[in-house]
Amino acid sequence: MTLICIAVVLFCFYLGMTAILYFTQRSKMYFPETVHTTPAQAGLSEAEEVTLTASDGERLVAWHVAPRGAKPVILYFHGNGGALRYRVERFRTLIRDGVGLVGVEYRGYGGNEGSPTEAGLFADAEAAYAFAAARYPAPQIVVWGESLGTAVAVALAADKPVGRVILEAPFTSAAAVASRRYWYLPLRLLMKDQFRSDERIGNITAPVLILHGLQDHTVPYAMGERMFELTKAPNKHIVRFLDGDHEDLDSRGALHAVGRFLAGDLDRAPHP
């Protein structure tokens, strides 16, 4: 009888913990910085701030820098705890080379109203794409996703014509990442926002570049490798950073790899 009582208590505890995590899951997935920062305040005076409207009416802050001539335009999607202002140095380096930028703050981020969800972020990405596509031809648009933003980038590039795709620390699915911590929960059944990039990336036909650190403690390198395997684009590349973690790839040569990719140099190199 004692063992039965213990089992019942443990089962009830498990159910309670599962319920708590289910109802609070989005607060554990999204960490929005809610402060609105203009490009000038962030130190990127070259950029203009524009307002986009998503299909559901949400208004979104975005940064825009026109490219020099036919140079690429980066359509940039940051991670779940990111903000455009954290990538100013990266943007500045790209802009110096004449590359353009359309960077969007998701709903709930950067002073925007609303709350982030998978469907919401996808709608935000489509609004950013519509802005870019109205000004630049599809082959000039390069989609760059970082961490959670890779799922947004994959979904967009799988559905819209783009010139190139850059995925920095991509993951196969949100459940796969979360299961490393919550291994004891049926996350594929519980998670509202699945972000199944593994099911979408095969639909991308544009050239793909994957950047991933072998020491990444947030999204294991094995997931980046798996995403590379699932990519059916005939022109695909993966650049591995031996000592790279999750957010330090710029200091390890990521922008150099991106520059070569944008210039088409990697297209002429043998695949790994």
Q: What spans do the regions from the language model cover?
A:
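An N-terminal hydrophobic leader/cap segment in hydrolases
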Residues: 9-53, 272
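Membrane-embedded segments
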Residues: 55-135, 146, 151, 157
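Short alpha-helix in the alpha/beta-hydrolase fold that links the catalytic acid
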Residues: 90, 197, 206, 220-229
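Primarily recognizes the serine-hydrolase "nucleophile elbow" in alpha/beta-hydrolase
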Residues: 130-184
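Short beta-strand/loop motif that positions the catalytic acidic residue
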Residues: 203-205, 210-216
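Acidic catalytic loop of the alpha/beta-hydrolase fold
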Residues: 214-219, 246-248
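Catalytic histidine neighborhood in serine/cysteine hydrolases
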Residues: 225-247
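Post-His helix in hydrolase/transferase enzymes
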Residues: 249-263
